[in-house]
Amino acid sequence: MKIMILGSGAREYSIALALRRVDKNLEFYFAPGNGATESLGTNLNLKDPVVLATYAKEKGFDLCIVGSESFLAEGVVDIFKQQGLAIFGPSKAAAMLETSKSFMKSFLKKYRIKTAKFLNTNDIEKAKNFIYSLTPPIVVKADGLCAGKGVIIAKTHEEAIEETAKMLSGESFGDAGKLVVIEEFLDGYELSIFAVCDGNDFVLLPAAQDHKKLLDNDQGPNTGGMGAYAPSSLANESLLRKVQKDIILPTLAGMKKEGAEFCGVLFIGAMIVGNKPYVLEFNVRFGDPECEVLMPLIEDPLELILAATQRRLRHSKIKIKKEFAVGVVCASENYPYKSSPKSEITVNNIPENSHISYAGVSLEDGKLMADGGRVLVCVGTGKSIEEAQKNAYKLCDNVNFKGKQYRKDIAHQVLK
């Protein structure tokens, strides 16, 4: 079976690793991939969705899995389907749940799904009036995709107005910020909840928790994510039932009414306030680093993806292992401020019940080099969260490159 995976991070690497676990004969092609994905398959220097679809058809690919949201925003799923190709991910219209925050918020309001009080606007005067109606802190979001960096939490009314003006002028995020979403701040705890959907039905995956801040104890600047763990004991059965009834089902029904059936991964960034789930954001693909801790917990991820793509989730028996996973991101020394010089990665040995998912790496003269940002993720699994964490950090100690930085407290929320 020939499978194309679109993206270049640890998320895409972890998907291939998980699929290889259930079928050693799979052939992988990554577009564009990274220096480590070459050890799992073939990297393709292709990015244009039309070119990718043509190539996939010519080479007789059986399945394409979209890892990165940028491909979804370009309508890669629609293009592949027009060619009669099997692809896992939502259409361009359905992907607007992530690619346009204003669309997402209006959708939530229309279908009465709990979310923070908000205003979508491109008018600074309307923005000011709404900002002064809120009690700080105040959340200001750029409408479009900003590589996970388009959200500001302002401590004062004045800061919120200043950040809104910078977005609307194009100074902060270019065209992505020329429409903004201003929100009340919700005070609770965040969970990442994933549902794999086929338009009508869904399979709920274990709830994960991401760690956005660079430093221990949730200090320092925001990042793309410094680690994750799953399942989270903070997501009790009662809460997950509410998420299914009050968020996932009305979202699938609503998207169908909008003429954009949702097939793929619905990633709910949820804020839990008094055991009630509110939608902070939707993403329409696996999170990174959450994907790296979810993949080891799915008994047969290939069957899950195929069942969703073929719209037969209702009849598919997807099993989740009774295990835990912890993923610790090792980042380059200057992350997230600026790029760092390349340096060779050495791995002394990989202990049992652990593995590495590679992201910001390149291959030079047969050597794997740390090449920017989040370099790799050390993943540990175990029968308890304590065991999984121990295995992840044992692996971390065996991985070295110049300036390696990582958090020492991943999963602290449930290990206090």
Curated annotation (Swiss-Prot):
ATP binds at residues 131-192. GO terms for molecular function: ATP binding; metal ion binding; phosphoribosylamine-glycine ligase activity. This is Phosphoribosylamine--glycine ligase. Mg(2+) binds at residues 281, 283. Pathway: Purine metabolism; IMP biosynthesis via de novo pathway; N(1)-(5-phospho-D-ribosyl)glycinamide from 5-phospho-alpha-D-ribose 1-diphosphate: step 2/2. It comes from Campylobacter jejuni subsp. jejuni serotype O:2 (strain ATCC 700819 / NCTC 11168). Belongs to the GARS family. Binds 1 Mg(2+) or Mn(2+) ion per subunit. SMART domains: GARS_A, GARS_C.
